[in-house]
């Protein structure tokens, strides 16, 4: 059963905490926060910033943030009349390690492939992807990241034991950027990590693992930041992945183009832009 949406009691608890801590503003980032919850907070003279990638309800607050590429198609739902919508990659909030411009270098030959499938790997694709890569007749090492909620480690280790390639296994590392900078090519689920890879400039094959990712992934393909999208729920996802990876392994110019377009799209400054606008809204309120 899905958790219940936050109610009036939850908003009262939040308000009491804000008063106790002498806060001037509140940032709300949860699928459980509905319009009523946000309204209760905003009506108590606290500047409220809602972070939402679903656009599932109206927004009675001062700031709404969605950094996805297709965010402008989703939002027109202010009920207070004064909502500032911070939409698109310009406001995509990345970890601090991605704030500075990357020193990524696109090499003519792929020597390192990174595989990262999000926190849970919902289709348990990691073992099969590693086996698929091991079948390719290229000389590269593989860095595989298993998320904190994935249940594939045992099967992954079985693949590693039989692999012809060197496969390094990482379990929920705190810092991803270093592994991204080492990679010449990545395979990634279509969540936040994909945007981090684009910001770094690492050419990536994307796997759709949730329906709400489809439009933004299609938009990234249209921009040239991605070459193709593979559907994690499709029975043919592995042949599709193999075809895409093989194509990119042999096309240095395309990898260079994808790297440049990704870095042009994302400069890593989204969190700072949002923070500065939140501060100025609090100051002017």
Where are these regions (language model features)?
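A nucleotide-sugar donor-handling region in carbohydrate enzymes
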Residues: 60-123, 153-154
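C-terminal alpha-helical cap of glycosyltransferases
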Residues: 267-285
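A short, well-ordered alpha-helix in the C-terminal region of glycosyltransferases
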Residues: 247, 254-268
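Donor-nucleotide binding loops and adjacent catalytic segments primarily
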Residues: 108-183
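Acidic donor-binding loop of glycosyltransferase active sites
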Residues: 181-192
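Catalytic binding pocket for nucleotide-activated donors in carbohydrate/polymer assembly enzymes
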Residues: 194-239
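Active-site and donor-binding regions of nucleotide-sugar-utilizing enzymes
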Residues: 1-79, 85
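C-terminal "capping" alpha-helix adjacent to the active site of nucleotide-linked donor transferases
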Residues: 228, 236-253
């Amino acid at each position: 059963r899905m958790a219940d949406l936050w109610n009036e009691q939850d908003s009262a608890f939040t308000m009491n905490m804000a008063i106790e801590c002498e806060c001037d503003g509140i940032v709300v980032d949860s699928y459980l926060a509905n319009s009523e919850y946000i309204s209760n907070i905003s009506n108590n003279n606290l500047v409220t910033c809602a972070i939402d990638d679903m656009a599932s309800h109206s927004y009675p607050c001062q700031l709404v943030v969605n950094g996805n590429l297709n965010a402008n198609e989703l939002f027109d739902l202010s009920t207070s009349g004064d909502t500032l919508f911070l939409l698109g990659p310009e406001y995509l909030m990345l970890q601090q390690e991605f704030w500075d411009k990357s020193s990524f270098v696109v090499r003519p030959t792929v020597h390192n492939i990174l595989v990262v499938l999000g926190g849970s790997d919902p289709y348990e694709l990691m073992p099969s992807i590693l086996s698929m890569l091991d079948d390719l007749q290229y000389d590269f090492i593989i860095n595989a990241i298993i998320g904190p909620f994935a249940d594939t480690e045992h099967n992954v280790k079985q693949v590693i034991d039989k692999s012809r390639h060197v496969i390094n296994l990482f379990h929920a590392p705190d810092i991803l950027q270093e592994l991204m900078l080492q990679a010449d090519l990545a395979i990634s689920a279509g969540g936040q990590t994909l945007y981090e890879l684009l910001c770094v400039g690492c050419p990536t094959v994307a796997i759709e693992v949730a329906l709400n990712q489809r439009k933004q992934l299609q938009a990234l393909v249209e921009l040239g930041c991605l070459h193709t999208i593979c559907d994690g729920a499709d029975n043919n996802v592995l042949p599709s992945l193999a075809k895409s990876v093989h194509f990119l392994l042999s096309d240095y110019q395309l990898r260079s183009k994808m790297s440049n377009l990704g870095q042009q799209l994302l400069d890593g400054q989204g969190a700072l832009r949002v923070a500065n606008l939140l501060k100025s809204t609090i100051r002017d309120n």
